[in-house]
């Protein structure tokens, strides 16, 4: 049911962590994968090499998703190289942990540009291809702070909450074309923060989770694969948490 043979996927921020795990699992299920990166070319090309080594098809694409014109060129390149697009995973994000009272408009802009406008730009440019597919999928990744709020993450939470509303709206608008749009909200993933900070605070952090550990990229990729496949064809407009029991709302 999670067979993705013949499908083409774009994963933003696909060179590292959760994005890399998603790329690899989609490829394992048979999808051709466009691995987007902003600055980590070596990482993205490493993911491509791993996929190709196991007989899969993948290519790295450099693009700042906050720039609408650059995104349009990337989508056009994917169409030219692969023939279309069936799956969009809005994974790339940028979040600064800082008290709201100490944050600046420059901080706000950087996070909103990547987290909200990035999803807007990619969804808008990919939309015609996803609708033409007849089985298009949009899956947006975010932190659970976008659902329940969190001190120090006000801007990132607000930007990602906007993405949740975008997914729900696109689920309604594009559903008649067979497109589904869902959000996955995450607890703290091991690879998403500075390793030294995680180790210094691990004992305190894990106490917030019903399952007493932090998340791994491998915890996220299976749900993305499900939603991208025919098995997820009747799931749309939803926010699904993969969070070890951090929040249960």
Predicted regions and their residues:
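Short, small/polar-rich loop/turn modules that mediate ligand/substrate recognition or access, typified
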Residues: 135, 175, 180, 235-237
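Short C-terminal tail/terminal secondary-structure segment
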Residues: 148, 208, 225, 236-249
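Alpha-helical segment proximal to the catalytic Tyr-Lys
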Residues: 128, 172-173, 233
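A glycine/serine/threonine-rich, flexible loop-to-helix segment
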Residues: 45, 172, 176, 183-209, ...
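Conserved glycine-rich cofactor-binding loop
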Residues: 8, 15-16
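Catalytic loop of short-chain dehydrogenase/reductase
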Residues: 97, 139-162, 167-176, 188-189
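Substrate-binding pocket helix/loop in short-chain dehydrogenase/reductase
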Residues: 99-112, 194, 205
């Amino acid at each position: 049911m999670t067979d993705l043979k013949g499908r083409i996927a774009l994963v933003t921020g696909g060179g590292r962590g959760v994005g890399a795990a998603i790329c690899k699992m989609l490829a394992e299920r048979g999808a051709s994968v466009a691995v987007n990166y902003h600055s980590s070319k070596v990482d993205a090309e490493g993911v491509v090499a791993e996929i190709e080594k196991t007989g899969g098809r993948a290519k790295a694409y450099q693009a700042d998703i906050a720039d609408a014109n650059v995104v349009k060129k990337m989508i056009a390149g994917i169409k030219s190289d692969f023939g279309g697009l069936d799956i969009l995973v809005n994974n790339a994000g940028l979040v600064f942990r800082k008290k709201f009272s100490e944050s600046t408009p420059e901080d706000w802009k950087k996070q909103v540009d990547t987290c909200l406008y990035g999803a807007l730009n990619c969804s808008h440019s990919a939309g015609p291809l996803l609708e033409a597919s007849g089985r298009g999928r949009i899956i947006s990744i975010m932190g659970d702070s976008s659902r329940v709020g969190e001190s120090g993450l006000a801007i990132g939470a607000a930007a990602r909450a906007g993405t949740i509303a975008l997914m729900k709206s696109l689920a309604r608008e594009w559903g008649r074309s067979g497109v589904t749009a869902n959000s996955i909200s995450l607890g703290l993933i091991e690879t998403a923060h500075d390793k030294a900070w995680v180790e210094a605070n691990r004992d305190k952090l894990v106490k917030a989770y019903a399952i007493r550990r932090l998340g791994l990229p491998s915890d996220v990729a299976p749900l993305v694969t499900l939603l991208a496949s025919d098995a997820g064809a009747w799931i749309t407009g939803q926010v699904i948490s993969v969070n070890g029991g951090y929040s249960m709302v």
